[in-house]
Amino acid sequence: MRLVQYSTPDSETGPQTDGDSAAQRDVVATNVDLAESILSQTRGLMFRRSLPDDYALAFRFDTAKTRDVHMLFVFVPIDAVWVVDDVVQRVERLRPWRSFERERCDLLVELPAGAGAAIEPGNRLVLESS
């Protein structure tokens, strides 16, 4: 699975990958883990000492609600991205041990610090099968 950003959102037709598309496609991460169980969602990136550059941890939810991200026991800075209906709502750099942020989302993505620098609110961010 990979995480892909489309710089020109088109909510009616979804992401377009053909050569005629006006949307610019950017692969953000090629190594994506899904946090599907309660245990994996609770643990998140806690206790990890490093993250590969092409890595993302994605949390998918059935409905868009306010979701928290804490950095307790997270030893590396990360970029967090909150997404509703494939549209980026917010991107934040979070510091180890100190940060706590919340935002409404149905997809939450945690990336290595700097990996979210080109992701902007309003762009589309989708999980695609490899």
Task: Show which residues each predicted segment covers.
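Compact, glycine-rich, soluble single-domain proteins
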Residues: 1-130
